[in-house]
Amino acid sequence: MNLAEICDNAKKGREYALLGNYDSSMVYYQGVIQQIQRHCQSVRDPAIKGKWQQVRQELLEEYEQVKSIVSTLESFKIDRPPDFPVSCQDEPFRDPAVWPPPVPAEHRAPPQIRRPNREVRPLRKEMAGVGARGPVGRAHPISKSEKPSTSRDKDCRARGRDDKGRKNMQDGASDGEMPKFDGAGYDKDLVEALERDIVSRNPSIHWDDIADLEEAKKLLREAVVLPMWMPDFFKGIRRPWKGVLMVGPPGTGKTMLAKAVATECGTTFFNVSSSTLTSKYRGESEKLVRLLFEMARFYAPTTIFIDEIDSICSRRGTSDEHEASRRVKSELLIQMDGVGGALENDDPSKMVMVLAATNFPWDIDEALRRRLEKRIYIPLPTAKGRAELLKINLREVELDPDIQLEDIAEKIEGYSGADITNVCRDASLMAMRRRINGLGPEEIRALSKEELQMPVTKGDFELALKKIAKSVSAADLEKYEKWMVEFGSA
């Protein structure tokens, strides 16, 4: 980016504004604002980036003032009252003595005459305060014969509130608060929806909350966590992986692994599903994908977890594929290819890591499979893992001294992590069910807390296992293992 060109365009924009050539001035202002925006994306130093954003904000204010001048001049040509002279004297405040004659009392009440005076006066004070910069000094010649409640006044007041909001956002960021993403160019509702429904900071899921899966934890540490701790090492050919695909049966802990990665790295966590990135309006889905990755780069370091990615980016070229679905897939592939993480000259601490999970890896598009460089298998828990899962799920429940969790772990072979959680939940409710059996509503309400806190016994688990069967078949496991032999990259 040529900084001299930025300075030259800003200078020309101000000169044209001072000479009264407002159309050319607005063109130069738009160009320099876009140049600064692109330059800010390439700046890595937060202090320097903040200064550039402050310069861009000042130029935006000047640009808005030029637009206000053009709007005022156009209004003079269209609806200027012919009976009252236009005064060009520059005054910081409006004097009620020089206002046009009041309208008849039957048309407007006196309180309504004075209300615009209270609203317009702070705006003129704000315009006078920033008049020292660039062409803003020419923004003061305003007709005193204007009607106080025109649409132009409302637009000016709205712009003043928006500019004040932007300044408050920047001041908050300088005070150490979380900066807010500037969604210029996007629909405000789309930005707010992604902020509200997707962004999850500090998920608070740690490695200790996940039983077993040591190989998967080791690979995820190497792919995501270690580049944050050792940025100087992971450069060049050792750059971090662009993306990781987690493959396995349902309920094996893929989502929890992604949240643990975000917690251990201290990154912003984006939990994305197919419903998040789809819209009934043409072109909106592609915008959502692009907006998601721009927000991820803004809040970097970031972890984007795309759950059930086969529903978003299934194999292209099939007979039942729709044009809109193909466009979304293409945009997703382009954005993922642009999120290179830490390339040779990039900062690994600003990387965007893409994690994906699927239960149907054989339906994923080949181009997406290439971009997800690491493809790991999340299997069913082993005997040791099942025992750890039982301990984690039952750590808040009182257990009978005679119960042996290792024996129960042997009986639940083939159960997924979610199945084991359901077994523990059902077993912990058995004592309560026996206690309230045959009681009426009033008697149940009268029970004390101590009467319900009965220890979980081995018999409770036996009853729960009779009611809950495993959800993954041997044929499904064979399909996963066959796919990993052909396409796995652990």
UniProtKB/Swiss-Prot annotation:
CDD domains: Kp60-NTD, RecA-like_KTNA1. PANTHER family: AAA DOMAIN-CONTAINING, KATANIN P60 ATPASE-CONTAINING SUBUNIT A-LIKE 1. Regulates microtubule dynamics in Sertoli cells, a process that is essential for spermiogenesis and male fertility. Severs microtubules in an ATP-dependent manner, promoting rapid reorganization of cellular microtubule arrays. Has microtubule-severing activity in vitro. Keywords: Acetylation, ATP-binding, Cytoplasm, Cytoskeleton, Isomerase, Microtubule, Nucleotide-binding, Phosphoprotein. Residues 95-184 are annotated as: Disordered. The modification N-acetylmethionine is found at residue 1. GO terms for molecular function: ATP binding; ATP hydrolysis activity; identical protein binding; microtubule binding; microtubule severing ATPase activity. It is an enzyme of class 5 (isomerase). The modification Phosphoserine is found at residue 174. Its EC number is 5.6.1.1. This is Katanin p60 ATPase-containing subunit A-like 1. Gene3D superfamilies: 1.10.8.60, P-loop containing nucleotide triphosphate hydrolases, Phosphotransferase system, lactose/cellobiose-type IIA subunit. PROSITE patterns: AAA (PS00674). One of its GO terms (biological process) is spermatogenesis. Residues 128-139 have a biased composition (Low complexity). It catalyses: n ATP + n H2O + a microtubule = n ADP + n phosphate + (n+1) alpha/beta tubulin heterodimers. HAMAP family: Katanin_p60_A1, Katanin_p60_AL1. The keyword Nucleotide-binding applies. The keyword Zinc-finger does not apply. InterPro entries: AAA+_ATPase, AAA_lid_3, ATPase_AAA_core, ATPase_AAA_CS, KATNA1, KATNA1_MIT, Katnal1_chordates, KTNA1_AAA_dom. Interacts with KATNB1 and KATNBL1. It is found in: Cytoplasm, Cytoskeleton; Cytoplasm; Cytoplasm, Cytoskeleton, Spindle pole; Cytoplasm, Cytoskeleton, Spindle.
